[in-house]
Every structure is written in structure tokens, then in C-alpha cells.
């Protein structure tokens, strides 16, 4: 059986943090891990920034304007982070949990799917484009990096984020992809409550998709 997430994954609520600094801290934490390093789940938001994954192409950034663009080492294409978005970064030793990359992606998607189901909202994942969708509109994005068997980067959920910056890119490399947010879906959006709810759903999904689970 996998360890209990409520005792063996430390949840850190970090508030608003610069993207580059957070990325650097994730890499440092991963590189310095040892056999006894605890797993952590970071809950954070970022000032406005576009991030370009390893598969990303600059032509998908249509008009960044004053918003900085950061080329990162996560998988995937281009996305936007900004205030009003909750970002979860699972810093996990995947072997402890019996997770592979695909099953961790599924766990992160299920985090949002299960949260929305609690509000009576049907959502789904797509095989061709990781993330969570409500009637074809993307409400959450997933992008990961695994190094030395350990994960970083993660899941971004649109709560009441300004959607205009998404119009300046092809989200996740898909021209015309529509984006939505929890506010427009009728989900009550007290931010601190949603942070805690998403963290709990994520911990539960890690167990479900880990050893002997749904992976």
C-alpha cells in the first residue's frame, strides 16, 4: 500500500511567487533530494507570465505584449499563469507512490474533475491534449518534468483569472482553443477554500492512481 498522503506529503501554501524563482526552487529541491527527502505539494499563484514548454514553438505566442515569456523544462506547449489561478506543484518521488508520468498526469486531471463533480459540473480529460475541459473549453492545464524519478511542475486551475491573456497565445499549441474558469462555471470561488479543496483532491488522486490504483 502507498503511504498516507495526509501524513507523508507536506502541503505548502506559498501565496503569490515569482515564476522563475519558484521554478528554480523546484529544480533545486529535486536535485538535492535524498532517499529520506519528504514529498511536498506546493500551492501557489504567479504574477502574469507566459511559459513555453519543451515542445513549445514561439509562433504559438501571438502577441505577448508586456507579459514576460519564460522557456521552461516542463512538457507541453505554451500557457499563461496569472493572479486568480491556483497552481499545484507535486514534488514527488514517483517510485514511492507507484506512479509513472502518465498516471501522475491522470491524477492531476482527476483532481479537477473530482472537484467539479462535487459542484455538479461534468468535465473530462483528453488523450490528445492533457488538461481538463468543460464542454470543450479548457479550465485546467497540466505540464510536468520528471528527473531522477522525481516530479516537478504540475497543474494550473483557472479560478477567476483574467482570460484576456489567453487570447494572445494558442493555448497549449491549439489555435482557437477556448478557455474558461471556475467563476464562469458557477463554482463559488473563495480562494483559500479552493486552495485547500484542490490540495485534498490532489492528495487523494495520488493514492488512487498510485500503487494498485487506477493507473
Swiss-Prot record:
Output the GO biological process annotations, alphabetical, semicolon-separated: protein modification process
Q: What does it do?
A: Catalyzes the transfer of endogenously produced octanoic acid from octanoyl-acyl-carrier-protein onto the lipoyl domains of lipoate-dependent enzymes. Lipoyl-ACP can also act as a substrate although octanoyl-ACP is likely to be the physiological substrate.
> Is Oxidoreductase one of the keywords UniProt gives this record?
no
Q: Which reaction does it catalyse?
A: octanoyl-[ACP] + L-lysyl-[protein] = N(6)-octanoyl-L-lysyl-[protein] + holo-[ACP] + H(+)
Q: Which UniProt keywords apply?
A: Acyltransferase, Cytoplasm, Transferase
Q: Would you tell me the Gene Ontology cellular component terms? A: cytoplasm
Task: Provide the leader sequence positions.
Answer: none
Q: Tell me which residues are marked as the site Lowers pKa of active site Cys.
A: 138
Q: Give the species this sequence originates from.
A: Alkalilimnicola ehrlichii (strain ATCC BAA-1101 / DSM 17681 / MLHE-1)
Quote the HAMAP family the UniProt record gives: LipB
PANTHER family tied to this protein: LIPOYLTRANSFERASE 2, MITOCHONDRIAL-RELATED (PTHR10993:SF7), OCTANOYLTRANSFERASE (PTHR10993)
State the family named in the UniProt similarity comment for this chain: Belongs to the LipB family.
BPL/LPL catalytic domain: residues covered = 35-210
Binding-site list for substrate: 74-81, 141-143, 154-156
Q: What is its EC number?
A: 2.3.1.181
Pathway per the UniProt entry:
Protein modification; protein lipoylation via endogenous pathway; protein N(6)-(lipoyl)lysine from octanoyl-[acyl-carrier-protein]: step 1/2
Name under which the protein is recorded: Octanoyltransferase
Catalytic center residues: 172 (acyl-thioester intermediate)
Record's miscellaneous remark? In the reaction, the free carboxyl group of octanoic acid is attached via an amide linkage to the epsilon-amino group of a specific lysine residue of lipoyl domains of lipoate-dependent enzymes.
Q: Which GO terms describe its molecular function?
A: lipoyl(octanoyl) transferase activity
